Swiss-Prot record:
Residue runs in coiled coils: 17-63
PANTHER family cross-referenced by the UniProt entry: CELL CYCLE CONTROL PROTEIN CWF25 (PTHR16196), PRE-MRNA-SPLICING FACTOR CWC25 HOMOLOG (PTHR16196:SF0)
Location (main, coarse): nucleus
Biased composition (Low complexity): 186-206
Highest taxon above the source species: Eukaryota
InterPro entries: CIR_N_dom (IPR019339), CWC25 (IPR022209), CWC25_splicing_factor (IPR051376)
Protein known as: Pre-mRNA-splicing factor CWC25
Membership in a protein family: Belongs to the CWC25 family.
Gene name for this UniProt entry: CWC25
Keywords: Coiled coil, mRNA processing, mRNA splicing, Nucleus, Spliceosome
Protein localization: Nucleus
C-alpha cells in the first residue's frame, strides 16, 4: 500500500513543500549577508571618524567628512582677532572694508527700525492710531455701548427740560345763590345753614 500521507498538502516530504523551505532558507541567507555588509560599513565609518578626530592639522581640516553640523563648532574668535589687528595698526583699512562696514551699519539700523515698528503695533488700536496719525484717539464713538449711554443721557435731559413745575393749590369755588338757596333761606335758619354748608354743597364735593 502506498503512503497516504503523501496525499496531504502539509506533508513535508512533498516537493512543493521542500521548495518553499529552500526558498525561505535562501532569503535568510541573503538577509544575513546584507546585515554583515552594513555592519562592516558602519565599522569603517567609525574608524574614519576616529582618524579624523585625531588629525588636528590645518591642512587636513578640509578633508574631514562633512556631517552638516560644522556650524556648531565654528569659532568666532577669528573675527575678534582681526578687529584687534586693525585697531593696533597691524593691518591696513581699505575702502572695501569701509564699504562693508557701512553696509553692515545700514542693515543694523533697518533691523532696529523694524523691531521698533513691531513693538509699536501690539494690537488693533495701534493700527488705528497709525492711520489717523494721532497718539490719543477717542474710540468711544465706535463703541455701541457708549453710543447707547450718550443717547440715554440726552433723552433724560430733554425729559427734564420738558417737565414744568405744577402748583398744588386748588381753586376756590364760591357758592352760587339761586332758587334752591332761597327756598332753604325762607324756612328754618338752621336747616338753610346746614344745606349751604361746605360739606353738603355740590360745588365743594367736586
Amino acid at each position: 500500500m502506498s503512503d497516504l500521507n503523501l496525499l496531504k498538502s502539509w506533508n513535508p516530504k512533498l516537493v512543493k513543500n521542500r521548495k518553499k523551505v529552500w526558498e525561505a532558507q535562501q532569503q535568510l541567507v541573503e538577509e544575513n549577508k546584507k546585515i554583515k555588509e552594513r555592519q562592516k560599513e558602519i565599522e569603517k565609518e567609525r574608524e574614519l571618524d576616529r582618524y579624523s578626530s585625531l588629525i588636528r592639522d590645518e591642512d587636513q581640516k578640509n578633508v574631514k567628512r562633512k556631517t552638516g553640523l560644522e556650524w556648531m563648532y565654528d569659532n568666532t574668535s577669528t573675527a575678534l582677532t582681526e578687529n584687534v589687528d586693525y585697531l593696533l595698526g597691524k593691518k591696513e583699512i581699505t575702502d572695501t572694508l569701509l564699504d562693508l562696514s557701512g553696509n553692515n551699519n545700514k542693515s543694523e539700523k533697518s533691523e532696529n527700525q523694524k523691531q521698533t515698528i513691531r513693538k509699536h503695533y501690539q494690537g488693533i488700536e495701534d493700527v488705528i492710531c497709525s492711520k489717523t496719525n494721532h497718539k490719543n484717539v477717542d474710540l468711544s464713538s465706535d463703541d455701541p455701548m457708549a453710543k447707547f449711554k450718550a443717547a440715554k443721557q440726552a433723552h433724560l435731559k430733554t425729559l427734564k427740560q420738558n417737565i414744568q413745575p405744577t402748583s398744588h393749590e386748588y381753586p376756590v369755588h364760591k357758592p352760587l345763590r339761586g332758587a334752591n338757596s332761597k327756598r332753604y333761606d325762607s324756612g328754618n335758619g338752621s336747616r338753610s345753614n346746614y344745606k349751604n354748608s361746605r360739606y353738603n354743597n355740590k360745588y365743594y364735593r367736586s
